Amino acid sequence: MTTEERIDKMKDYLKEYQNWLESPDFDEETKNELKSIKDDEKEIEDRFYKELEFGTAGLRGVIGAGTNRMNKYTVGKATQGLANYILEQGTQDKGVAISYDSRKMSKEFSTQTALILNANGIKTYLFESLRPVPELSFAVRELKCTAGIMITASHNPPKYNGYKVY
């Protein structure tokens, strides 16, 4: 990679960091978290050099502010993408079952997921309390849902959370 390419890459993640600080789309708690790392370029780079991507195990990442972190913004983006797909398929009336584990932010992420799907006219079945993956799997089949979402990072360390779609 040339020096010029490195500078361009650096500009991209710094530009995204600045966008999150200045945009009215992000709440004060998020902005304060980002302000606390303003002098740590490596941390800024790690949080913004890429967006979380779906892998074989869904989305997984450290909880925190940034495009490369699990937070209400990345969960919202993933959920809206799934909603768009469900609407394209015309299966919104079948619904989506949603479950979560005991990790930090799991309940909040699952509630947000249900609200976004509902706002798109998609029926949801949100468990009232934490449930294991096999119970979600059973619910998807029993209720004949078009999809199931599990908020969990499985075996990853406690600072992680995840978003799995079935």
Model-derived segments and their meaning:
Residues 1-4, 119:
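Low-complexity, intrinsically disordered short peptide segments enriched in small/polar/basic residues
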Residues 3-113:
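An N-terminal, well-structured beta->alpha segment
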Residues 18-20, 91-166:
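Ferredoxin-reductase
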